[in-house]
Amino acid sequence: MDKKTKLLSKKVARIRGLIQAIATLLTNIHIPNLLKGKIYQGKIKTVCVPGLNCYSCPAATGACPIGAFQAVIGSSRFKFSYYITGFFILLGVTLVRFICGFLCPFGWFQDLLHKIPGKKFSTARLKPLRYLKYIILIVFVILLPLFVTNSIGMGDPFFCKYICPQGVLEGAIPLSLGNTAIRSALGTLFSFKCLILITVVVLSILFYRPFCKWICPLGAIYSLFNKISFLNIKVEGSKCVGCNQCSKACKMDIDVCKTPNHPECIRCGACIKACPKDAIQYQFLGKTCPKKEQQQSTITNR
């Protein structure tokens, strides 16, 4: 990769980080509530946000789609929601895992952790663990809330309650710091969830986005739409020289030339930045997103 490409890569990487920061702020706009130890409960809280963001976070703007999905499945009255299902389909078809790469607060949290200096390890040999998130989706998000119910027919949100580290990071910890009653009620389950959070934090420092790759059920849902979405990655075979720089740059362990729109692709753009021949580009609705150089050429020729 030449000096110019490296500079461009760094510039785009900074822009992506800025987008992630803005998305996280908009998803958690009620920051003063963090000091008060109470949850925002306005009308907009019924609207789902695109990424994994705990409803119980005092600063949260909206609802977590996975939490809302479990609430419906575990309800004694309703087992299906056109709103939640439509939400997943709409975002899945339009943005897919671009949400994971640019808009998810917990994805950004893992990115920041991975920037901590130290030895890093590849997850290429751990690819079978990718399927774990689909098992978690089916078992903890769907089956357990649906069939393991109490005396009045209500099921617990098993993923949120027993697995999700975001709930501890954004919900339990800030709420307990600002509310004495909640702090005194914390018990074994909180300790167990803290252990999960610590494990994810340590793994995120060593590996790139372990939670996204192996555990996240929201990523599992969005991945189902990766090959049919409006937003995809286009590899121009006529320009590709087979240098494999794109796959080397991909931290999601994808063979970009063979499967550019693999279910694991989070549309981060690392492969686009790494390609020395400009053979890889974003496409939206079949139209290639013009690069800066192409736009300048078009203006010059007018």
Cite the ranges covered by each PLM segment.
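Non-ligating segments of multi-cofactor redox enzymes
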Residues: 1-257, 263-302
